[in-house]
Amino acid sequence: METLFSGIQPSGIPTIGNYIGALKQFVDVQDDYECFFCIVDQHAITVPQDRLKLRKQIRQLAAIYLASGIDPDKSTLFIQSEVPAHVQAGWMLTTIASIGELERMTQFKDKAQKRADGVPAGLLTYPPLMAADIVIYNTNIVPVGDDQKQHMELTRNLVDRFNSRYNDVLVKPEVRMPKVGGRVMSLQDPTKKMSKSDDNQKNFISLLDEPHVAAKKIKSAVTDSDGIIKFDRENKPGISNLLSIYSGLTNDSIKNIESKYEGEGYGKFKGDLSEIVKDFLINFQEKYASFYNSDDLDDILDKGKEKAQKASFKTLKKMEKAMGLGRKR
């Protein structure tokens, strides 16, 4: 069975877009792959974090994974910082990465421009750590969005470089992009991706938003003025985005939804979608609360840590042997 790896930062509550574009799709592939789902808290500290808030968000994200349908008997759910092999392998890959290729990363350049107080080295070395997250589990498939595509290209280059310079130790991962309709955009600016870090609260729906507040956000979402419910990302980005949300939460095809609302106005469509979103959040948050407040959550994370440590140790030892680190035993 092939291995799939994905990591999410505990830097805020995931949005309904993260659920439709990632979490929901993870649930669907649990039977097809050996899945490792990682809460990447060491990536989160590349920007300043309040320690108590970070700890809370780590637990919240774990509960959100489980509420989404991740089954700990099928998948490995764990916290990055509890598996030392991540940073150990990350340092090894950092030694074969060049400053130039790290500085060319678009995310580094964007974030560096916003840091008037100096650029942390961790922002620059983020990609080799991300590469290590992936390769230490002999990952075959990595589901990523467009924003991580450049990092994945670097990961594949680092794998080639390591295998060429040392031994053919690392598995070269393949990138899997989200399915069509799986990308959810901002509610007020549907030309950009929905983001949990957006300054405008009306642009996104958090998975822990009050359901009635989320319903209002749907009703006030930007659309065009022609009143035709049709998926056309280029010419009708607003209504296309709402169709993606409707389809993602109901599992109904966009084509069927278009037929259902043929001749109907946006008011009827938005009203129905707002109820769908509200009902989804009520159900989701009930599951979330049951996991967040349960001792079972810690048992699940402990089990995941042990499994991840065992799996990553094997690859780490191969990397160390290939590079000549430590003593021969």
UniProtKB/Swiss-Prot annotation:
EC number(s) per entry: 6.1.1.2
Role, per record: Catalyzes the attachment of tryptophan to tRNA(Trp).
Residues that coordinate or bind L-tryptophan: D133
GO BP terms, alphabetized: tryptophanyl-tRNA aminoacylation
Main location group: cytoplasm
GO cellular component, as recorded: cytosol
Keywords: Aminoacyl-tRNA synthetase, ATP-binding, Cytoplasm, Ligase, Nucleotide-binding, Protein biosynthesis
Assembly with partners or alone: Homodimer.
Protein name: Tryptophan--tRNA ligase
Stored PANTHER family: TRYPTOPHAN--TRNA LIGASE, MITOCHONDRIAL
Subcellular location, record wording: Cytoplasm
Keyword match Aminoacyl-tRNA synthetase: yes
Motif ('KMSKS' region): 193-197
Reactions catalysed according to its record: tRNA(Trp) + L-tryptophan + ATP = L-tryptophyl-tRNA(Trp) + AMP + diphosphate + H(+)
Annotated residues for binding of ATP: Q9, P10, S11, G17, N18, G145, D146, D147, V184, K193, M194, S195, K196, S197
Protein family according to the UniProt entry: Belongs to the class-I aminoacyl-tRNA synthetase family.
Motif ('HIGH' region): 10-18
A Pfam family the protein falls into: tRNA-synt_1b
Superkingdom of the organism of origin: Bacteria
Molecular-function GO terms, alphabetical: ATP binding; tryptophan-tRNA ligase activity
